[in-house]
């Protein structure tokens, strides 16, 4: 019987695909352990385009109102329009040239992308929404040689009511994960998160942050893959602990209304600014249901709404309008 192959000898794209499928199972099982309903699997393919994925969806539970943990593995041709939009961040990304004319070809660039994307919206207004996404992307030249590659991702917390100890725990465990690789990473990725999840027209962040990085190719890909795995491993110990603290707390209709207003902000960011949403909707054969899985079941927009000064609602806005440091 031949010896099992060392996973590190496989292409990075295969290692990343195996990682996200394993983490999808771990995360859904962990979240199910504190709810009365189970995730159901929705497997999809891209039709004539390459690849597909599995969306694990939970809805109408006693703990989680709506949530999804989606794995996608897609490949095919990246359109010239998509290449043009992305090449500013990737100098090696370019349209191949026709050897006869020397002009860029019109059928795009071959690509592979895989990732796990998750958003969870709890029932209780005191339990925070969370988002997690880790992904890998690569392109090839027409002859099959690699052209460019990068990782992206992160995890963040979006509470309706601020609990200092929750923010500290979430940030500390993700800092610990990054510190294993370089103590300079957490401050950089924390700042990146605050800047990325910013709702410009509201002049506030979407939540209280976490970590975020994109177009990341500064280290050996094997090292980045291990960093991503360590960040994955920080998620359940932090988020499950927080939700267990909050899921059975009493709440009022007024607190539910504030939760719906804050979820309106979530919708605004995801539909207007989020790069992943925009990329997904531009990709031929992409699945709209999976892309918009992040949207909450209920959201609200009240005209010219402002919380009372000194209220708990106003305290949250102090943090979203001026991001703070959560750990030393």
UniProtKB/Swiss-Prot annotation:
Residues 57-66, 266-302 are annotated as: Important for dimerization. GO terms for biological process: heme biosynthetic process; protoporphyrinogen IX biosynthetic process. Keywords: Cytoplasm, Disulfide bond, Heme biosynthesis, Oxidoreductase, Porphyrin biosynthesis. It catalyses: coproporphyrinogen III + O2 + 2 H(+) = protoporphyrinogen IX + 2 CO2 + 2 H2O. Coiled coil: none annotated. GO terms for molecular function: coproporphyrinogen oxidase activity; protein homodimerization activity. It holds the Pfam family Coprogen_oxidas. PROSITE patterns: COPROGEN_OXIDASE. Its EC number is 1.3.3.3. Optimum pH is 7.6. Homodimer. NCBIfam families: PRK05330.1. Belongs to the aerobic coproporphyrinogen-III oxidase family. Present with 22000 molecules/cell in log phase SD medium. This is Oxygen-dependent coproporphyrinogen-III oxidase. It comes from Saccharomyces cerevisiae (strain ATCC 204508 / S288c) (Baker's yeast). The lineage of its organism: Eukaryota, Fungi, Dikarya, Ascomycota, Saccharomycotina.
């Amino acid at each position: 019987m031949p010896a099992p192959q060392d996973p590190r000898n496989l292409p990075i794209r295969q290692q990343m695909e195996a990682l996200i499928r394993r983490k999808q199972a771990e995360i859904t099982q962990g979240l199910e352990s504190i709810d009365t309903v189970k995730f159901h699997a929705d497997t999809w393919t891209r039709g004539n385009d390459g690849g597909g994925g599995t969306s694990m969806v939970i809805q109408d539970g006693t703990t989680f109102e709506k949530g999804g943990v989606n794995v996608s593995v897609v490949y095919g041709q990246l359109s010239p329009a998509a290449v043009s939009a992305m090449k500013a961040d990737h100098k090696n990304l370019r349209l191949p040239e026709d050897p006869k004319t020397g002009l860029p070809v019109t059928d795009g660039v071959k690509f592979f992308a895989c990732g796990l994307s998750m958003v969870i919206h709890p029932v209780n207004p005191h339990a925070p929404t969370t988002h997690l996404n880790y992904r890998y992307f690569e392109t090839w030249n027409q002859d099959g040689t690699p052209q460019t590659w990068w990782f992206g991702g992160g995890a963040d917390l979006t509470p309706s009511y601020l609990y200092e100890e929750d923010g500290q725990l979430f940030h500390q465990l993700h800092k610990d994960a990054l510190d294993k690789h370089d103590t300079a990473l957490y401050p950089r990725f924390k700042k990146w998160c605050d800047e990325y999840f910013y709702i410009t027209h509201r002049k506030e962040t979407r939540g209280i942050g976490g970590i975020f990085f994109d177009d990341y190719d500064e280290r050996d890909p094997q090292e980045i893959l291990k960093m991503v795995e360590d960040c994955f491993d920080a998620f359940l110990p932090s988020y499950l602990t927080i939700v267990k603290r909050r899921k059975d707390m009493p709440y009022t209709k007024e607190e539910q209304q504030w939760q719906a207003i804050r979820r309106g902000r979530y919708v605004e960011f995801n539909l207007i600014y989020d790069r992943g949403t925009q990329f997904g909707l531009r990709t031929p054969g992409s699945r709209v249901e999976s892309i918009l899985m992040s949207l909450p079941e209920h959201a609200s927009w009240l005209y010219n709404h402002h919380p009372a000064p000194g209220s708990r609602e106003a305290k949250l806005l102090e943090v979203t309008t001026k991001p703070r440091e959560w750990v030393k």
